[in-house]
Swiss-Prot record:
One Pfam family from the record: Keratin_B2_2
Xref: InterPro entries: KAP
Encoding gene, per UniProt annotation: KRTAP4-16
Protein name per its UniProtKB record: Keratin-associated protein 4-16
Region spans: Disordered: 203-235
Record organism: Homo sapiens
Length: 235
């Protein structure tokens, strides 16, 4: 417990010697008063947490300065936005449990413990993708690097295997009607040319000997003349 016997800064000795709730005043943080577990809610103001306080319970989510990030202050329960760069924890925090999707700096990805929780759409560096979680049969959409192609996979460093083909070929996207009018119409396919069918002419077959005897030709009719009796001509 903080007491009046504990050393405080000369300018705030009267304030620091008051009750324990006032013991963690910003002017007292240079003393051992802020190294104990007696820091109360008065230490949770944004201007209170000093580097010396980061190992104590004084480091609450609303009381974590960037200077605290080199210590255990940068935990899930004490990761203040001021402790982060672009809503991600500083590299010094990458060894702690500060690996969360909302608090993971790209430089944290060099750690093997970062990838399972750091591979989110907003925070996944190529170093994560070398892990088996991204190098197997499929790559999850939320585990791609921003420079990766989302549809197929991968940044050259994301997957050791070649990019996977799409399961089905994507159908062609139809053009709008006004654009289709501006395009030249494709030439119509001409019907296939029919090759002329050559009908073979009957070749003269050699005369074969007939097995049946030739039929006799019918007798020619004789010219019809009136019959003349020679005797009647003599009379």
């Amino acid at each position: 417990m903080c007491s009046s016997k504990m050393p405080c800064s000369p300018s705030a000795s009267s304030l620091c010697a008051a009750s324990p709730p006032n013991c963690c005043h910003p002017s007292c943080c240079q003393t051992t008063c802020c190294r104990t577990t007696s820091c109360s809610h008065s230490c949770s103001v944004s201007s209170c947490c000093r580097p010396q306080c980061c190992h104590s319970v004084c480091c609450q989510p609303t009381c974590c300065r960037p200077s605290c990030c080199q210590t255990t202050c940068c935990r899930t329960t004490c990761c203040h936005p001021s402790c982060c760069v672009s809503s991600c924890c500083r590299p010094q925090c990458c060894h702690s449990v500060c690996f969360q999707p909302t608090c993971c700096h790209p430089s944290c990805c060099i750690s093997s413990s970062c990838c399972p929780s750091c591979c989110e759409s907003s925070c996944c560096c190529p170093c994560c993708c070398l892990r088996p979680v991204c190098g197997r049969v499929s790559c999850h959409v939320t585990c791609y690097h921003p420079t990766c192609v989302i549809s197929t996979c991968p940044h050259p460093l994301c997957c050791a295997s070649p990019p996977l083909p799409l399961p089905f070929p994507s159908p062609p996207v139809p053009l709008p009607f006004f654009l289709s009018l501006a395009l030249p119409s494709p030439p119509r396919p001409s019907p296939p040319l029919l090759s002329p069918v050559l009908i073979p002419s009957p070749s003269p077959s050699p005369s074969l000997p007939s097995l049946s005897p030739p039929l006799p030709s019918p007798p020619l009719p004789s010219p019809h003349f009136p019959s003349v009796n020679p005797k009647s001509m003599l009379q």
